[in-house]
């Protein structure tokens, strides 16, 4: 059927990506995990969750990476951001839903808004940390050879800080996934809605299956991003 062909095609594409980035073991787990999700009938919900996670992560990275770079190069910015990031990381996840609902109502948009804010701190912190850990003698040598600030950033600091930055990206993706599941409480949809339905309607089996799908998706995203980080480090 067309539905089966589409699902099989999506599984195949993700299997190739996983094989290339993370190796045979992760690739096999990816294809088996996605086929299990499809077999449980949660394919559409999984794709909704994945789309929300990826879109939220991209926006969080667009905002977080420049903040991390700025924080690494400005003590004043670092002093301002440090307590803000501490507050963001200690605040309970459910609290982020309140301003999201207040400004955007119910649905996917407030879910994405809450996810972006919740998932941003790791990439800001680890980008700043990675750049600060670049050896000072390397920075000074680059400057002595006439490197401009932009050349120093993009050709020296960011490449050397990339393993740490990739760890931040990995954590941002996983925090996005955890928040997307919680955001089902404000009608964000996806796998979180299945888990929430299982809890509220006492359908233990349904909630357990939804939880398994979330875990599979989390492991796939974690291993692929870790594989990408190792590949960059090897280069």
Give each language-model segment a name.
Residues 7, 225-235:
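Transmembrane alpha-helical segments of polytopic membrane transport and secretion proteins
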Residues 10-17, 30-36, 95-99, 159:
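Hydrophobic, membrane-inserted alpha-helices
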Residues 44-60, 93-126, 160-166, 206-211:
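Loop-to-helix entry region at the N-terminal start of transmembrane alpha-helices
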Residues 1-8, 12:
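Single conserved hydrophobic/aromatic residue that forms the stacking wall/gate
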């Amino acid at each position: 059927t067309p539905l089966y062909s589409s699902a099989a095609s999506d599984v195949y594409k993700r299997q190739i990506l996983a094989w290339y980035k993370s190796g045979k073991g992760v690739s096999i787990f990816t294809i088996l995990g996605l086929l299990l999700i499809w077999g449980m009938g949660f394919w559409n919900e999984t794709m909704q969750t994945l789309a929300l996670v990826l879109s939220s992560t991209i926006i969080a990275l667009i905002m977080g990476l420049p903040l991390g770079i700025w924080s690494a190069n400005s003590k004043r910015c670092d002093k301002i951001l440090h307590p803000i990031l501490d507050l963001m990381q200690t605040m309970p996840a459910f609290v982020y839903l309140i301003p999201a609902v207040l400004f955007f109502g119910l649905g996917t948009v407030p879910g994405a808004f809450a996810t972006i804010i919740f998932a941003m701190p790791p990439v800001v912190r680890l980008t700043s940390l990675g750049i600060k850990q670049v050896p000072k003698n390397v920075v000074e040598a680059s400057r002595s050879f006439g490197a401009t600030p932009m050349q120093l950033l993009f050709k020296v600091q960011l490449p050397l800080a990339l393993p740490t930055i990739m760890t931040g990206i990995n954590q941002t993706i996983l925090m996005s996934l955890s928040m997307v599941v919680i955001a089902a409480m404000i009608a964000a949809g996806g796998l979180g809605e299945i888990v929430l339905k299982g809890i509220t309607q006492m359908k233990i089996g349904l909630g357990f299956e939804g939880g398994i799908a979330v875990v599979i998706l989390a492991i796939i995203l974690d291993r692929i991003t870790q594989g990408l980080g190792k590949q960059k480090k090897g280069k």
